[in-house]
């Protein structure tokens, strides 16, 4: 059984027991988080009806907070000697899916 959930502006396909890296969610490691909205559930049959999915949630547990890979940004203007370097690391949360109900 799997589900497709939307969090942090992205969609993730999850199944029970999966570890998923998502945009940062506030909470301490070990805390439980319910992910909604659920866009699709596949069990005995595929469910995409909004009225049936309103009662479905994906229960997860926060495993850890981490950072993604460093992204390097360089602004450069020709002939003027203007250069600006910048770096960024996105904050992520690792979730473990404990159940789809």
From Swiss-Prot:
<dbReference type="GO" id="GO:0003735">
    <property type="term" value="F:structural constituent of ribosome"/>
</dbReference>
<dbReference type="GO" id="GO:0019843">
    <property type="term" value="F:rRNA binding"/>
</dbReference>
<dbReference type="InterPro" id="IPR001787">
    <property type="entry name" value="Ribosomal_bL21"/>
</dbReference>
<dbReference type="InterPro" id="IPR018258">
    <property type="entry name" value="Ribosomal_bL21_CS"/>
</dbReference>
<dbReference type="InterPro" id="IPR028909">
    <property type="entry name" value="bL21-like"/>
</dbReference>
<comment type="similarity">
    <text>Belongs to the bacterial ribosomal protein bL21 family.</text>
</comment>
<protein>
    <recommendedName>
        <fullName>Large ribosomal subunit protein bL21</fullName>
    </recommendedName>
</protein>
<keyword id="KW-0699">rRNA-binding</keyword>
<keyword id="KW-0694">RNA-binding</keyword>
<dbReference type="GO" id="GO:0005737">
    <property type="term" value="C:cytoplasm"/>
</dbReference>
<dbReference type="GO" id="GO:0006412">
    <property type="term" value="P:translation"/>
</dbReference>
<dbReference type="InterPro" id="IPR036164">
    <property type="entry name" value="bL21-like_sf"/>
</dbReference>
<keyword id="KW-0687">Ribonucleoprotein</keyword>
<dbReference type="GO" id="GO:1990904">
    <property type="term" value="C:ribonucleoprotein complex"/>
</dbReference>
<dbReference type="Pfam" id="PF00829">
    <property type="entry name" value="Ribosomal_L21p"/>
</dbReference>
<comment type="subunit">
    <text>Part of the 50S ribosomal subunit. Contacts protein L20.</text>
</comment>
<comment type="function">
    <text>This protein binds to 23S rRNA in the presence of protein L20.</text>
</comment>
<keyword id="KW-0689">Ribosomal protein</keyword>
<dbReference type="GO" id="GO:0005840">
    <property type="term" value="C:ribosome"/>
</dbReference>
């Amino acid at each position: 059984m799997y589900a497709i959930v939307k969090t942090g502006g992205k969609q993730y396909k999850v199944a029970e027991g999966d570890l998923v890296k998502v945009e940062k969610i506030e909470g301490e490691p070990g805390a439980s988080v319910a992910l909604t909205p659920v866009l699709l559930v596949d069990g005995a049959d595929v469910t995409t009806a909004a009225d049936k999915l309103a009662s479905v949630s994906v229960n997860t547990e926060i495993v850890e907070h981490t950072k993604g890979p460093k992204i390097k940004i360089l602004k450069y203007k020709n002939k003027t000697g203007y250069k600006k370097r910048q770096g960024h690391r996105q904050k992520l949360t690792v979730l473990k899916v404990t159940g789809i109900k």
